[in-house]
Amino acid sequence: MMAVIGIDLGTTNSLGCVYRNGKAELIPNAYGSYLTPSVVSMTEDGKLIVGQPAKDRLITHPERTVSSFKKDMGTGRSWKPGEKSFLPEELSSLVIRSIVEDAQNYLGEEIEEAVISVPAYFHDEQRVAVKRAGALAGIHVERIVNEPSAAALASYFTANEEQNMLVFDFGGGTLDVSLVDCFDTMVEIVSVAGNNRLGGDDFDRLIAEHFLREHGVARQQLRAQEYAVLLKQAERCKKLLSEQDEVVMHATVGDQLYESTYTMDRLFEESKALLKEIRQVIGRALKDGKMTIHDVDLVVMAGGSSKMPLIQKYIRHLFHKAPMVQGNCDELIALGLGLVCGVKERKEEIKDYILTDICPFSL
């Protein structure tokens, strides 16, 4: 039997995973990393570049490079990184194909089937677009799994403790919150809520906008490459605040160099509107699941942006308990998909596990 792989098709990064030797195993790419940036760039001679080399061109060739296209899956919006236009599912197929090729090289066998994760709040057209992306990449999409559901399976498989779990899945471009009832070998999704237009990238844009406003610079004054550099600096600032109390951010506009100092307190004040949106999503999930904050035994953090200390501090404030940060938040969904592959392949140690997923929209 050919291996089935799990693909966490992310807004910012994508990962591959397989179930073998009794565990879910992440698949490294050609650069030795588990994370493949969900970025596509077109060179001047029409060649398409995917992953880290494409991400490197976001700064040098922003007009020929596209990212965060997953958010527009199923909308009909097109992107033009060069002379040709691409739908989001066409761009996503290139990322999927890259993951599949890395898996084939790593496992030494052909891959024809995959289980792919999507935000829980993706509607039917978006889910169909993901399946189409798989078909364009030359693989059969065996199953679509909600991202927080995969994270819940990975967490429960490790802890194996009966509990009411809330999965807080905060990626680069989307937020999903799921309430999960875990018992015996059952992982049952009780409710889901989400915002497909809210993610860690919004904090980058927020920092960039406040930086420009502080220095009286209009967004229109920046060339595309200057704004790309500014966003990169904002992302760097956000990440450094995970390690430092204070960060100095620099950016050049025209021939003028500007700088601002950021602290966690300042970021919290400037992020209040985004944090309010996060709280609203959590509130909807709790209401739909007929639970209160006090009914939640464990909060599981998933998605790369949930690593932000600001986010973890806010979740701790809301639930009055520390959330569970299991290993690398970037990898939890992919590991869950690996387990789904193990269930599908009837692997002895996991074949009895059942994941009951739900779709928040009528199909």
What does each model-found stretch correspond to?
Residues 1-75, 79-85, 94, 101-363:
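Oxyanion-binding/catalytic loops of NTP- or PPi-dependent enzymes
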